[in-house]
Amino acid sequence: MSVEIRETPLGGSLRDFLNVVDYIYRDDPQYVRPLNMDIKETLSPKHPFFEHGEAAIFTAYRNGWCVGRCTAQIDHLHLERHGDEAGFFGFFDTIDDQEVCSELLEAASNWLSARGMKRVRGPYSLNCNGVVGCLVEGFETPPVFLNPHHRPYQGGLIESTGFSKIKDCYGWRYQVGDIPQRVRKALDDVNGMPEVSSRHADLHQVQRDIRVIMDVYNDGWSEHWGFVPLTEAELTALARELRLILIPELTLITEINGEPAAVALALPNINEMIGDLRGKLFPVGLAKLLWRLKIKGPKSGRLIILGIRKSYRNVRKYAALSLYLYAKMNEAGMATGCEWGELGWTLEDNHPVNTGIKMMGGKIYKRYRLYEREL
């Protein structure tokens, strides 16, 4: 029987869109279902992305059963910045069925083409500041917080619809512990500079400190492929969301002569705490999550931001700043009981950052692929 594609308006019922993953990943022990609340907020018309973006939501049905999902979206800030006439697809999950995949991506492509896009790229949920890529390597371990997980067949299905790889992103596994001598020297050198000071984020000033971190991030990452800075509204929403899970010791703001120059931000790996919640925080999921986070504590985390302001990046005196940040975050991980973390993602051609992670002993253990097709 043929595949039926249904479009759901923003703000409409997401029941099938949310629940289809239970069927797709029913026999995958590594899959961790994201929280329904997070996806509903992301796809709500009130989400700050939609101040500069638009999207459509698609679900696929065969014999009346939901068997796949995806979104199509346009980020007008991306278009203004890069001028590449690229629209995105995201939230891509499907059974092992080429027709289902093809019909979903065709629906997304047609929606984007009707709005003037010349190419479609993804998966992005919803843009580069969200969940990025299709997992093509590292299926044997669970995903960490805010990173994707897919079945091994899904990347091949995407390629079979005419998409090709445009970029790989690396997920690095890092074991918290002793650091190499070269990194120890970098830590000691920067610690010995009187103009350099470091502090953690203040939970009583979360809005202020998240803005500081993201300001340095926006500056330091501004020349990277596909980058789009967070807007003021997105910064405000991010600070509000992080306040609930932020561990101050896993944040770092490094100042030079009183000016924020380098930052790092790691989050507890919420996925290790929600695997049995099946996406639901209520009626008892929230209590379980808070106990596991605040009382039991995380055993792993994800370093999502590490950046240096451009004006300091090529100053010889501060060449050790990136290794200093890694070393300080390693110390923070030990102090908070974290045993390991995922660093990244990082772009495959971001050689300076990738080299620094290798120096710390990080190893690539997951690969997230971005695909593109001309329309």
Model regions and ranges:
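A structural motif corresponding to the C-terminal lobe/cap of the Radical SAM core domain
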Residues: 359-370
